[in-house]
Regions:
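N-terminal strand-loop element at the rim of the active site
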Residues: 1-53, 121, 135, 207
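Conserved donor-binding/catalytic core segment of Leloir-type glycosyltransferases
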Residues: 161-178, 184-187, 199-200
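Short hydrophobic beta-strand element within catalytic cores of glycosyltransferases
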Residues: 264, 269-272, 282
Length: 338
């Protein structure tokens, strides 16, 4: 198996972050070929020729936004002797534009089949696939490459966090649809003030941070919200999850999320909103909470978690539930797609 990735993934005007490149070493046990320029049609031709010469039986295209449709379409059209399967994270992005109606249909036509990472995404694919090609869904496997479960105290020390507090973790890029504003409002609920809590926001802001800072100030939260506005490198991910008591994803819209699968690996209870495919992965009352998407329901779940000390029960269940999400199972779904 060979992995083909990008020399240029996004042009700078589409990428609001500080860098789109991983700074750590590449995995030593994988053959990774950096050769795809997402914006250069001449490059697509050359890459397709190279891939064709390798005579692969199967090519899996990881698809998550419409921007990549022209590049992927051009590659797939030239791989005439290779079966092309789309591994679909999102068929339609969370923040839609006119291009999201124009670009995906051509990509869908060039694929021989589809594996979606949630039922809701599978439904989106089915609406676009007029040829009724083979398709299935399989949840994203657990992300197990970020390190081991370690003592909470060690993680807090590494992050410079006070161990007298319990931590709610909001992890990942901050965008409007992810509902951090709802979480801040929920966290300000007076019923939670009797507990020693801190909200830890770890991720780069992809939009104006000022409205969030104003909300924190207006609710009088002050030092109760700790913000680490930066892309979190792989080697630091374990500290944030090992430090957390609960991982909160208060999304306003979603299909599925890799954050849940990191939380499963580190056996951390989760609070998600019941939008998209999130509640498929986080059964309510088993490994955490799947609640209505509004601040009041989020606050109610947080209160239940800390008031009734649900942590140990959820962790026991997490150890059982996470066995469902193996990479072998996803591979079998892809290989058996008919």
């Amino acid at each position: 198996m060979d992995l083909y990735t990008f020399t240029l993934q996004y042009p700078s005007f589409l990428f609001p972050g500080k860098t789109q490149y991983a700074e750590g070493p590449a995995p030593a046990d994988l053959k990774i070929v950096r050769c795809i320029n997402s914006t250069n049609p001449f490059n697509w031709r050359d890459v397709a020729r190279h891939i064709s010469r390798e005579h692969y039986d199967l090519a899996v295209f990881a698809y998550w936004m419409s921007f990549f449709a022209p590049c992927y379409t051009a590659l797939a059209r030239r791989l005439k002797k290779t079966s092309c399967i789309a591994l679909v994270h999102n068929m339609m992005p969370h923040e839609k534009s006119l291009l999201d109606k124009v670009l995906p249909p051509s990509f869908v036509k060039t694929m021989d089949g589809f594996v979606a990472l949630s039922r809701s995404v599978l439904e989106d694919v089915a609406k676009m696939d007029k040829a009724q090609k083979p398709k299935a869904w399989s949840p994203h496997p657990v992300y197990d490459h970020f390190g081991a479960i370690e003592p909470r105290e060690n993680a807090l020390e590494h992050l410079g966090l006070d161990p007298q507090y319990r931590y709610l973790l909001f992890f990942g890029l901050v965008r409007a649809y992810k509902g951090l504003d709802w979480l801040i409002e929920a966290f300000a609920d007076e019923r939670l003030r009797k507990y020693p809590l801190r909200l830890l926001v770890a991720g780069e802001f992809y939009e104006d941070k000022e409205p969030y800072l104003k909300a924190i100030q207006s609710y009088g939260l002050g030092d109760a919200v700790v913000i680490r506005d930066a892309f979190i490198p792989d080697e630091q991910v374990k500290d944030y999850f090992n430090a957390a008591d609960i991982v909160v994803q208060p999304y306003k819209s979603a299909t599925q999320s890799g954050v849940t699968q990191i939380a499963y690996h580190f056996e951390k209870p989760m609070l998600v909103t019941n939008v998209g495919g999130l509640e498929e992965i986080v059964p309510n009352g088993v490994v955490g909470y799947a609640v209505e998407p509004d601040p009041r329901h989020i606050a109610n779940a947080l209160l239940d978690f800390f008031e009734h000390d649900r942590y140990a029960d959820f962790v026991r269940n997490l150890r059982v539930e996470k066995e469902k999400y193996s990479w072998e199972k996803l591979a079998n779904v892809i290989l058996n797609l008919k």
